[in-house]
């Protein structure tokens, strides 16, 4: 059956969640984990005293939590982790690596939990079991033989706990390198850098309570209905309290049109809450121009719209910024944003009305552009004009995608941690951290491709499928002497390897770790809380991430060094005692975890204290530009389907966009299809362009969709092959997955 014959298409939905979400969740839970194991897990997930959802980083309520404090994606993440299926020695004996390469990412996901450590020896066709001790000694021998510690790459996924992340970066720095790339490099790195430059802190400045006091909530470049479904509950509560929600995005997404709360009887019977009152269909990468337009209106109106007292007391470079904005024409703003002057003026009026309590939320739609840092700083500029930061009901909210990606950075997973952190680490741990900055994700790929990095170690994740320029990244990994992955399930990164490859299976977030050990996570709003698994481990061979790191560190650095690795791993309280001596805000760490629901880390910008060199919040003055494709070409953005969390493919459907049984599709404006003589469902080949380079992806089905002319969208990881390794956000190094210049032609086989 052809891809077109498999494809089923319906009208895109105009609301999210409700009974279909409940049915989808339960079907997946029952199929993968079974009603008893899956049901018990759901009752513990996101509860006080339970375990943190392994999916997104949206926070749990501080006070009362419902008995079902999870969403469809969280339920699927738990089902995936709690599955009864196992992939062990017999599975890998039946399937060669070449055979596994031919299967889809969705098929890989369905094969179950990795049962025991596995090795792909040089020249072998199949993975084979290996003992833990032999695996650690093998990795240690490769690390010890490197010409320099900087020839090793230590990658981290946002799933790793605070305790695992802290021990991991301590191991890497004890070994002698700052090569600590992580998944944040590919998503919110731009947010952290922009906010640090503008307001002195790289984290969001709002709490859940602020949403209940906000007058206006901007959702920019994000799709909460799929990527952060529990956020819809918060937005619904805000709307019921009188807030207006504004969607700013090239696509109208169902989750912001309407919401049927899956725990409310009225919603099950058909009642839906309208969320967004306004939809601004900005052109791809037109957000900087849009926010510059908002600033222009606010400055034109002067005093009534501005918080002049805040500007005078708390900001710097206001007049420079004012002159810049006043010199920009409306023609430029309209052309670059794709939004009309009337729409911009109406939105500016909403922002400036009343008490100017405005929250702006954003995700990858802002962060994965060449000018991402400048765009996010422009968002901050508008907040500074309004004084909409550091007060109740107002602030900045980068909505992070993985459950502990923010905590991992707090723990030191970063290739360029500041001197105060390294000095504290050295003082408390008795090591000498390197000061030379390490490689981020893209730099790591380039180093492997140049044969400069020879050992790649990943603490979680699916590196090959998460990164840009898939073919280039595959070549880079294949040049390594050794690639190792700490994983729970099979993924494509296990199949495109160095000369020797290891899979080290670990416990999941939902599983018991000894008698009483637990870990902690930090959510998107800076709340640290304990996470204690309750389900029996999938296999008796599994080790915790902490124990894997500790045993590897001991095998590599010896038992008699400054850091007592195994002793630390035996009782996680000991790791937390070390963390509190190194990382500000974690004083009395273990004791404070007794507080129900965890504790908030300090946030200077929320308190209107600006940790910038100037000591104030800083207006930025970047030039206004927009990504422009050549004549006859389109601008492609990559995005998720609904049956997907990051690179994990739970199913083949994208329910809210009306797509079933297909993933190799490209959403196109109907007029763009017409002028290219492309009919709906036609197979097309896509070519991307970067400088003098081209990349190809063949056999995508063309789907007409409500998207701005000149724009296109396709799912990742399938479309990652088109994202050039050399195209990165200025300053942050984030791949520009939301702005890829492409052309499309009918496939020869069509």
Regions found by a protein language model. Name each.
Residues 1-50:
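Intrinsically disordered, low-structural-confidence terminal and linker regions
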Residues 2-22, 112-400, 426-606, 661-698:
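Cofactor-pocket helix-loop regions in the catalytic cores of large enzyme subunits
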Residues 50-56:
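Short cysteine-rich clusters marking metal-coordination/redox-active sites
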Residues 79-126:
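Low-complexity, highly charged intrinsically disordered N-terminal segments
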Residues 103, 107-121, 637-665:
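Glycine-rich loop/turn
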Residues 566-655:
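Long, low-complexity segments enriched in small/aliphatic residues
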Residues 674-732:
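C-terminal structured "cap/appendage" subdomains that terminate the fold
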Residues 730-750:
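Long, low-complexity intrinsically disordered regions
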